[in-house]
A protein has these predicted regions:
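Structured, active/binding-site neighborhoods that engage oxygen-rich ligands
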Residues: 2-47, 51, 55-76, 84-485
Length: 485
């Protein structure tokens, strides 16, 4: 989860500087929302728990093309700064059968107008690129379960320093399990085996895609995350969206959020001198790399647009795009991304991820920083427990790309979370990426089988696969039994 309200902002202007959100935003929040206290939000998934918990957090404009082989409708790098009078365009991308529709929704003074354009896609091309088979399904499942498992096991060390991780978990660090979770004030807010807000919000995106028949709609996601912030998932026993990050909290509780989430996010970012770039967007977007992975433009624009609903810093968009493009490329398994043995050519994948993600950055210096995190090969370079900076979006993205270079899921995720810092978020992104690379069978069974809400998650996956078959004639169901064995 991104840095929570009241816990010291973890968004950073660079590796060496941090900037907190300035000013009191309470006058711009809806009066009925929970107000952040000095120590954080009183939120809990466990009945009777009173521990104060919130989290550290922190996406940009772009040209919105019609996915599945691109149709441009928006501007490239560096959109205009939002003002109270600005008209913002929120692109929604829908796929009907093998046709693509990009609808842009303009918002001004509470009014909406929509225009849609359609682009036909050659059926043979798209189905060939989708490459639907049992291997693909196992990688999709690896992405989803990898995210949730990495999140849940990462909770064990979240907000601890590396030294504290060793003190608490040294005896069992080679075989960490959910039941090893220490019972301190923070961790008692979640039951054993539960994931946190990172995966909650990923599932919000997943449900939005399913219930809108493949359309990726920032407005719909905005409504869902606002509702989740107030109630969580009641069907799972939640009474609030546990662990909301600072940037997310202030954005979704602005009065203008549902009318224009992009503008709301930009105003919150502006109050922080446009320097806060925390990880609350990249943590949730892995599922966008799965949906219609055959077209990278589709993935890129959806990742950027959903990130931007709460996080206005371009680095937040760039990091979300990099992660989602990597997942999509691995699902495609195109020859240019494989070596002679059929294994992934990680260098080629990184270079292509950089090409897409760097579109959201304006200067060579910012692009160089992006690449330095993508190429990271040693965890110590990321300084994941660095005081006051644990929630920087590039630290989380860097964790994912470090994991991409590993070959053992359990060992890699354990090593990563034992670095401390924002471990659940780093674990979620790394778990999604490595799970996609190594498939779901690479994830330790003691982690997948002991996820608290495993069966609930499986029903959502089942709904997605059936939606893709019924609406888009893309059939994953022969390779999916409805549950993990």
């Amino acid at each position: 989860m991104e840095q929570r309200v009241g816990e010291g902002d973890t968004g950073m202007t660079s590796l060496d500087n941090q900037t907190k959100v300035k000013g009191d935003l309470s006058d711009e929040l809806e009066s009925e929302t929970i107000q952040p206290t000095e120590d954080g939000l009183v939120t809990s998934k466990v009945e009777g728990a009173t521990c104060t918990s919130s989290k550290g957090d922190n996406a940009e404009d772009d040209s919105t093309r019609a996915l599945l082989r691109g149709f441009a409708t928006d501007t490239p790098v560096g959109g205009a700064t939002a003002s109270d009078d600005d008209t913002k365009t929120l692109p929604t991308v829908s796929v009907s059968g093998l046709s693509v529709s990009v609808a842009t929704t303009s918002v001004k003074d509470g009014t909406e107008s929509q225009s849609a354009e359609h682009s036909k896609i050659q059926t043979d091309l798209i189905k060939k690129t989708l490459n639907v088979n049992s291997d693909t399904v196992n990688r999709i499942l690896g992405t989803i379960f990898g995210q949730c498992v990495g999140d849940a096991i990462g909770l064990l060390t979240e907000f601890l320093t590396k030294k504290e991780c060793k003190e608490h978990y040294k005896a069992m660090k080679k075989e960490l399990e959910f039941s090893h979770k220490i019972d301190d004030c923070h961790r008692t807010g979640w039951k054993t085996g539960d994931w946190t807000d990172d995966s909650d919000q990923m599932i919000l995106i997943f449900l939005s895609i399913i219930e809108n028949h493949g359309t990726v709609d920032p407005f719909d996601f905005a409504k869902r995350i606002k509702d989740w912030g107030a109630k969580g998932f009641p069907e799972l026993g939640d009474n609030v969206g546990m662990g909301q990050g600072r940037t997310t909290y202030f954005t979704i509780n602005r009065r203008d959020f549902l009318d224009d989430p992009y503008a709301a996010a930009e105003r919150v970012w502006t109050r922080g001198d446009k320097t806060v770039a925390s990880n609350g967007a990249v943590m949730r977007t892995s599922i966008i790399g799965v949906h219609m992975y055959a077209d990278i433009d589709f993935v890129m624009h959806n990742a950027a647009n959903i990130a931007r609903t709460t996080h206005a810093d371009p680095r937040c968009r760039a990091s979300a795009v990099a992660v989602c493009v990597a997942i999509a490329l691995m699902l495609q398994r195109q020859p240019q991304h494989l070596d002679k043995k059929g294994n992934y050519n990680i260098k080629a994948i990184i270079n292509e991820c950089y090409d897409y993600a760097s579109k959201y950055l304006e200067t060579d210096e910012k692009k160089k920083e992006l690449m330095s995190y993508l190429k990271c090969t040693k965890l110590k370079e990321l300084k994941l427990d660095e005081s006051g900076k644990i929630g920087y979006t590039y630290k989380t993205m860097g964790s994912g790309f470090w994991a991409l270079k590993q070959d053992n899921f359990g060992k890699a995720i354990t090593k990563l979370i034992m670095e401390g810092g924002d471990a659940d978020t780093n674990g979620a992104v790394a778990g999604a990426m490595l799970g996609c690379k190594l498939r779901v069978g690479s994830i330790p069974t003691c982690w997948t089988q002991n996820l608290l809400h495993k069966e609930w998650l499986e029903t959502i996956i089942d709904r997605y696969f059936h939606m893709m078959k019924e609406v888009h004639n893309i059939d994953f169901t022969p390779y999916w039994t409805g549950h993990l064995s």
